[in-house]
């Protein structure tokens, strides 16, 4: 099962992070959480393990109107929120990989009517954000 939408861009990591933030904002998403995986691994494991992962940022993106609709439709759906967006250094020089969770995979766990429509709208917005990069 494919659970991610992925694009690779030819821009440096830090520049791509800002581009992703801007693209998500344009689509009505705010960033609720931010996990710098490299820094966390350096602090909790070792610098060598952090370097093996490289630059890797997990952004927890939330579109408040969609989240409100989802939570009022199925209160348990909050266990699957927010939508994760990963920005990580790509394999090639100057490449950065951006990935977003496919909301359709998340809502397969809910049997509440209406959740699929909300997930489709979130998916459309996430794809638009990735497409603008």
Please report, for each region that a protein language model flagged, where it lies by residue:
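Terminal, regulation- and interaction-focused segments at domain boundaries
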Residues: 1-28
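A structural signal for short, well-ordered beta-strand segments
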Residues: 7, 83-85
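Short Gly/charged-rich anion-binding patches and loops
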Residues: 18-19, 36, 73, 121, ...
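Short, intrinsically disordered, mixed-charge
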Residues: 22-26, 76, 128-131
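Compact, glycine-rich, soluble single-domain proteins
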Residues: 30-32, 37-81
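Beta-strand/loop substructures that line and gate deep hydrophobic ligand-binding cavities in soluble
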Residues: 87-111
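Well-ordered alpha/beta subsegment
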Residues: 107-133
